[in-house]
Amino acid sequence: DPPYNTGNKDFVYNDSYVDSEDSYRHSKWLSFMEKRLKIAKTLLSDKGVIFISIDDNEQANLKLLCDEVFGADNFRNTLYVRRRTKTLNLQFAENGLNSLNVGAEYILVYARNGYLFKEMRVKKKDLPSKGSWNVFWSNADRPTMRYELLGFTPQTGQWRWAKDLADEAVENYRDYLYNHAELSLEEYWEQTGRSKKFIRRIPNGFGKNGGVQYWVGPSDTFLRTSNWTDIEVSQIHKDFELPFNNPKNVELIKEILQAPFYKTSFILDFFAGSGTTLHATMQL
């Protein structure tokens, strides 16, 4: 969580605060960051990862710098995190605005080499009542996964599951149609332990997938993407008796700390600030 270079004297270069009047403030900030990022790279393990929080002031410059330091191939994601928006002064809004209110900040994610995310799931606000049918064909290219299924064999791409699992899913759906059609597929899935898989083929299906579909049951979670706008980036400083204007949200840091696929990690916070990283670590 480095200084954002907002022009409000938020970082020191050569023993002097840098403000918005300094015509070299962007280059000074980049020099300030480059030294620290190079040290960070030497400390990262082969499976290490670095998360860097930033806003619009330097996001574009920081991305280029990180591509240079860590290698563009080691860029993983830009995470988008919700920012508390300020109330607009309606007196000025009525005359037109130079720009829209800023509603998000960014977290750049770079790996050393072999970093892996685990599957991260987020609770949905409302549980869907229906499952959905999805295309069973994938554009990956493993010839061993191109087998005959329901009278169709893909010529390119592949099926999503191994043949034995797919054949079982076909039989599951046939059993449902012939013996349990008085139930909805969702009800049947619930009654059988929410574990059965189903595959069908749409009549006269054509195209790369031949109309073959697999069923995904209702879920109270969804797979997390790079859109983290369900989490606010900062906590209101008045919530804490701390001399910091924008302490990071503990829940955000906890989510970051739980992102790695690996069970054990060493955690380093270069700009400890209000101690949120330690706080989050102790809560895990």
Regions found by a protein language model. Name each.
Residues 2, 265-284:
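A phosphate-binding catalytic loop at a beta-strand-loop-alpha-helix junction
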